[in-house]
């Protein structure tokens, strides 16, 4: 182990997803080798993220305003809502250029072993959003685009149970074709676009 601030930096970097001890050490020593202005810029960006980035009050996506740019865009179809687990999944769907509706970010997936139940996700907000007729528009279709893994499928099944009795609402699930056990963010644009286009009705 190293001493003082160097080890503190390695420890903090190691808490980031996908960063193991060796990667954390490599990044730390890279940061030690760069010029002070570069460190200042990185510090400033982290400060802006801490102070200026929040979550959209409508969909839960990351935003620097109360409403994200997608929810604020009148060209987006408010009657079509795509439900995803995390903000990174919004970006994955956006890269396909196949979806012109809006989103609802759950903030995760059901995982009882990790203590994540329906109360820890933004499911109640989704139900309220459907019932409140956002901007005077009825939500006509909810596309469930949770990850194709055990937690994502459990979340999709739960959502179908919660949504299936709402009058006039169509509930669909993105089509198979995505690798089981994978994450939406790693799917290529063509595969994910086809999964959206081939979505199937759940009720």
From Swiss-Prot:
The keyword Isomerase does not apply. Signal peptide: none annotated. The keyword Zinc-finger applies. One of its GO terms (biological process) is DNA recombination. GO terms for molecular function: DNA binding; zinc ion binding. It holds the Pfam family Toprim_4. Disulfide bonds: none annotated. Gene3D superfamilies: 3.30.60.80, 3.40.1360.10, 6.10.250.240, RecR Domain 1. Keywords: DNA damage, DNA recombination, DNA repair, Metal-binding, Zinc, Zinc-finger. Residues 79-179 form the Toprim domain. A zinc finger (C4-type) spans 56-71. May play a role in DNA repair. It seems to be involved in an RecBC-independent recombinational process of DNA repair. It may act with RecF and RecO. Belongs to the RecR family. This is Recombination protein RecR. It comes from Mycolicibacterium smegmatis (strain ATCC 700084 / mc(2)155).
